[in-house]
Every structure is written in C-alpha cells, then in structure tokens.
Design a protein with these regions (language model features):
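Intrinsic disorder/low-complexity flexible regions in very large eukaryotic scaffold/regulatory proteins
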Residues: 155-156, 188-192, 220-227, 260-271, ...
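Structural detector for internal amphipathic alpha-helices that build alpha-solenoid repeat scaffolds
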Residues: 37-38, 44-55, 72-84, 104-117, ...
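Leucine-enriched alpha-helical scaffold segments used for protein-protein interaction
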Residues: 5-201, 216-230, 242, 254-258, ...
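Amphipathic alpha-helical segments within extended alpha-helical solenoids and repeat-rich scaffolds
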Residues: 199-204, 231-236, 270-280, 316-328
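Charge-dense, extended regions
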Residues: 445-447
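Polar helix-capping/helix-linker motif
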Residues: 115, 165, 248, 313, ...
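Structured alpha-helical
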Residues: 440
C-alpha cells in the first residue's frame, strides 16, 4: 500500500538524518535491536530497513546488507546504493541462497521493480549468477529485476543460453526471454529456429511471445503457417479427457488475436489447403486433424470478429469443410458458429456450392449426414435449419436436379403429438414442384 511505503520512507529518512548527524546520540547500533532483535528483522519493519539502506551512507548500507540483504533489494530503492554496496548485496544474496535456496518463501509471488540497481558496474557480478545451474530463488529474482534494465544488451549471450536451454525450468526460460525481448538489437530469427525445432509447450510459448512482440506482419505467411502446424502437435488425442494443467495452449489463441484480417485469410488458405484425414479412421476415431482443426477453428472465429458481411461462402467452406472435432460448440462459445447460424445468406451460399452440382444420391446422403446434420465431428455452424430445407428444395427444383430434390424429401410427421399435427409447408412446397415438372412427380409418386 502506498501509505505504508510513505510511512516507511519518512521514518527511515528521519532515523538516517539523526544517525548520520555527528552530534546526535542516536546510532544504527541503538536502532537495530528494535528493528531487528537478535539479528532477525521484523517482517513489518523490513520496508523501513530497506529505505534506511537506500538513504544511508556506505557504512549504514553495509551494516544493513549484512543483516538482511533481501530486505534491501525488495524494499526501498536499491538503485541508490553505492557501487561497493551493490556488489556486497549480490555476494550476500548468494550466501543466503547457499544456506536456504528458497529464501523468498511466500514472497516468491511478489513483483517489484529495481531495474535501476543493475548498472554497468555490476554486470560482471551478475553473469556468474545467471549461469549457475541450481534451482534456488536467486537466479529467478535477478531475472525478474532485469526485465527493464538497460544492461540486458550486455547480458544477451547469458540470457539467450537460458532461453534456449531445454533443461531449464519454464519459469527461468520465460523470465530470460522477457529480458531478451527488451533488447532491440537482438536477432530473434536464430532463437526462433531453435525454439520451434524443440517443439515443446514451453519453447513454442516463448516463440509465440517473440512473434507477438516483433509483430506477426514482419513474418512470411508460410513461416507463420509452419509454426502453427508445429503447435498443432501439442493437442492430445480425443481419449485424453482431462489434463493436469489447464490453459497450456492458450498462447496459440493469444497469438491469433494479433493477426490482421489479411494475415488470417492467407494463413487459413495455407493451413486448409488439401486438408484431409490421412489416418484412414472414422471421424469419431480420427485424431490426425485434432490440432489443426482447433487452430483453424480459432482463426475462423477471429476472422469473423474482424471481417464484415458479405462473406465469401466458397472460401469459408474451404476453411471449415474438412475440420474434425470431438465436441460440439455453442454460438456463445464461438463467433464462427454464431455467424454461420445467424447469417442465412452465408450458410445457404455454402449449401449451394456443396450440394448444387451433386447428382449422386449416396454422395449427397453422406455429405448431409457427415457435415450438415448436426454431426458431432463437423463444424458446429454447419447445421441445416428448416428454412435451409426449403432453400435446397427450391434450388434443386430450379436446376432440375431431381436426385438432390429426392434426397431431401420430407416424410409425413405421423408421430407428432396431436396438437402439433397439421399442414406441412415443406410437403406443400414439394407438391407444388411435382405439379410443374413430371420428373419430380415420378419421384414423388415412388416415394
């Protein structure tokens, strides 16, 4: 809280002025037994201790650093420390970690900024701390504080090594990559190649962040589509119902949100070109399109968020026609499902393109069942509504496509409740068709 920090600063300023006054009887030795009895700083007074070090002279700084080095770094303004005090602080923190690797304890999740602490005179002291291979808190703490430091460019080799090392923890690699992202001169192309080749969840997450910061428009669409194809391998098969960690692939959706409409169109064309099942299994068993279907589905959602009607129905079908899902999605969960269900013109444009040329009744039946009858594994927006049946019957009648018309013949609704029974507008429409063309009457009579 701000009021607490102000109170700590004012109290420290008052005490330091008295301690450094040669005629005042108050000394640091007299204050410490109250602030840190038995050499252990009170938790509620660690902020006061940190500000006293920041405002005090070299002697005061050295004494407080020896007492509680972490309090000096985490509180007050460590950038005000003298050069020798900064070095002493780093050495003292290293000693503390050697005795207690997890010295931050519950303070681990705290975030604070001390970027001004890292200046040219401490760069050489930092390098060995970054390259040590232990799992203590010190290295992570330093990386957190380095995020906005101006000396990152001098630490680029060490930071790059941490980022690209697959044996490092996710926490360390992520922090190191954030430091690299603040180096304007750093060449990320080589790092991206290593991260994408590793193809782990952590490495691809870092790579996605690099692409976000650099700007997706700076990358060739072929490069981006290749990256997304690698990301598709992160998705499990349909039998893996539960995952221990939720949201590990959220970075893919976040990256997609940075794509422009033009970039999305190019990527969707690239990713769905010649997309088909290559495992030969039934759609409910097929896992070879899981990842790419999820990614393309998210991209189509983003496309509909950006694009305005009218839409190119043929292109939309090419994007979503061969996707395979193992769960249905509702309109409030997916923008593409919402648009496809609400936009009759788009949906019926797709219907015209798909069914219009077909004359093989078996093929019509298979496409209808697998893609448009609310099938569990097709895109949830591809669903035929009652007005779509009317549209298809009229389309077939106008184009003299008897086979298509016959494939959508409507039965008598004999099993409806008595109060729901009555005239059927679809059958009435079909009867009108049969009165106009004998070919349709023959099928109607046979039916």
């Amino acid at each position: 809280p701000v009021h607490k920090i102000v109170a700590e600063y004012c109290a420290a300023d008052y005490l330091i002025k008295r301690i450094t006054d040669p005629v005042d009887v108050l000394t640091l030795t007299k204050c410490l037994p109250v602030i840190a009895p038995n050499g252990t700083a009170r938790d509620e007074l660690r902020g006061l201790l940190g500000w006293m070090a920041a405002l005090g002279n070299r002697s005061v700084q050295e004494s407080i650093i020896e007492l509680d080095a972490y309090a000096v770094l985490a509180n007050g303004d460590p950038s005000q420390l003298e050069r020798s005090s900064k070095r002493q602080l780093l050495h003292r923190l290293k000693e503390i970690e050697a005795a207690d690797p997890y010295f931050r304890r519950s303070d681990f999740w705290r975030r604070f900024s001390a970027a001004g602490f890292f200046t040219q005179d401490v760069v050489e002291e930092i390098k060995p701390l970054l390259t040590m291979g232990n799992e203590g808190h010190l290295r992570g703490l330093i990386l957190e504080l380095l995020a906005d430091a101006p000396v990152n460019c001098q630490l680029a080799p060490e930071l790059s090594l941490l980022t690209l090392n697959s044996n490092e923890s996710e926490h360390i690699r992520t922090l190191a990559s954030r430091c690299l992202l603040n180096i304007k001169e750093y060449d990320f192309i080589g790092a991206l190649a290593v991260l994408i080749f590793e193809a782990s969840n952590i490495s691809l997450n870092i790579a996605a962040k690099i692409i976000e910061v650099a700007g997706p428009e700076k990358f060739n669409p072929t490069y981006l589509s290749g990256f997304l194809r690698v990301c598709a391998n992160l998705y499990p098969d349909h039998k893996a119902q539960f995952e221990r960690v939720v949201g590990t692939r959220y970075f893919i959706k976040k990256l997609i949100s940075y794509f422009s409409q033009h970039t999305l169109e190019l990527l969707l064309d690239e990713l769905t070109h010649n997309l088909h099942c290559h495992c030969g299994k039934k759609s409910y068993e097929c896992d070879c399109r899981n990842g790419i279907s999820k990614i393309v589905g998210s991209m189509v959602d983003r496309y509909f968020e950006l694009a305005q009607a009218p839409f190119d129905s043929v292109r939309i079908w090419q994007w979503i026609g061969n996707l395979n899902f193992h769960r249905q999605c509702q309109p409030d969960q997916s923008k593409s499902v919402q648009v496809l269900r609400e936009n009759d013109t788009l949906r019926q444009g797709i219907i015209t393109y798909v069914f219009g040329p077909l004359t093989d009744r078996k093929e019509i039946f298979n496409i209808r069942v697998e893609k448009f009858d609310g099938h569990l594994h097709s895109h949830s927006g591809l669903h035929l509504w009652r007005n779509d049946y009317k549209f298809i019957l009229n389309l077939a009648f106008e184009t003299d496509n008897v086979d298509l018309w016959t494939s959508f013949l409507v039965n008598h609704q004999r099993y409806k409740n008595r109060e729901e029974q009555g005239p059927d507008d679809l059958r009435a429409q079909m009867r009108q068709h049969t009165l106009s063309k004998p070919a349709f009457m023959r099928e109607w009579a046979r039916f």
